[in-house]
């Protein structure tokens, strides 16, 4: 059997006997020093230190190699770099491909810390960044400069959930700037609902903190690269001291085993709740990529194989501070917290001017309070009842 279905891949990826040593899961190998029995063994390890050979703890142990192999199998990459969090994955992946005088082109709906890294850190190092509308499509060529080295996508966009026309964007970039490295924050799709490298994207980045871990109790970042970019990414990450502890690598691998079934439930529940919200009189708009009418829905339908549980909706009015507190402080099932991707439902709200402030060279087209929710694994009926009670508090 060569063409395995996703669930089968998730259960088995990275579980070869060299990593499990007779157990079901990969072993947890914690190490800094790794011992060589002979001079020849040390020479062999040195020659193969970048190819899954035990050399030094910062290069990885069996636990890391198991996860890296699994991620490459799932996303179709030549190699996978591991980082202590998603922000580290984004920052170090971008940094690997730019130098003084270069230009980055980034969607203006990218995660705010990704924007800040470019403007506040790389800006001081002589790297410039400009921004494009997430729905720009082939017109992205208008923003490409002779020194554009990185094109950074995030689809769906952070908070407002716009989906790119990725084939049009990639084709346009390849035509005008064939050497530019195209990378994507692929966290919403968990790297498996959108197969970025199959769309000629060079690097797929995830905050594995979200769906890969799946329980809101650890942080990890991954970057899966194609053959063109893997060696440069790998060595830059190593030289920057980027690494992941063995225990978190193990927890990430363990999270993969249930990722398929969790994502299906997140999708089913979030779509039911999104449809309920779309018909609620206090809701002006629902931003759910899998919901008809959401920005870029046709692109999601064409390019993605499913949906996760994160989306947002806009209220008919802008809540006052008192209303905001009454609304958010009294949910019984929705917890107010950043991040997402765990088994629990989360909620957080932003005023339109707050979103506009993190949309460089853009703005917002709504005036009501925006509410972002992550739909967890609780009963849909119970979650709807909790949301209904929230609406009753702000009538």
Curated annotation (Swiss-Prot):
Pfam families: Cys_Met_Meta_PP (PF01053). InterPro entries: Cys/Met-Metab_PyrdxlP-dep_enz, Cys_b_lyase_bac, Cys_met_metab_PP, PyrdxlP-dep_Trfase, PyrdxlP-dep_Trfase_major, PyrdxlP-dep_Trfase_small. It catalyses: L,L-cystathionine + H2O = L-homocysteine + pyruvate + NH4(+); an S-substituted L-cysteine + H2O = a thiol + pyruvate + NH4(+). Its EC number is 4.4.1.13. GO terms for molecular function: cysteine-S-conjugate beta-lyase activity; pyridoxal phosphate binding. Pathway: Amino-acid biosynthesis; L-methionine biosynthesis via de novo pathway; L-homocysteine from L-cystathionine: step 1/1. The modification N6-(pyridoxal phosphate)lysine is found at residue 210. It comes from the Bacteria. Disulfide bonds: none annotated. Keywords: Amino-acid biosynthesis, Cytoplasm, Lyase, Methionine biosynthesis, Pyridoxal phosphate. It is found in: Cytoplasm. GO terms for biological process: L-cysteine catabolic process to pyruvate; methionine biosynthetic process; transsulfuration. Its cofactor is pyridoxal 5'-phosphate. Belongs to the trans-sulfuration enzymes family. Catalyzes the cleavage of cystathionine to homocysteine, pyruvate and ammonia during methionine biosynthesis. Homotetramer. PANTHER family: CYSTATHIONINE BETA-LYASE-RELATED. This is Cystathionine beta-lyase. It comes from Salmonella typhimurium (strain LT2 / SGSC1412 / ATCC 700720).
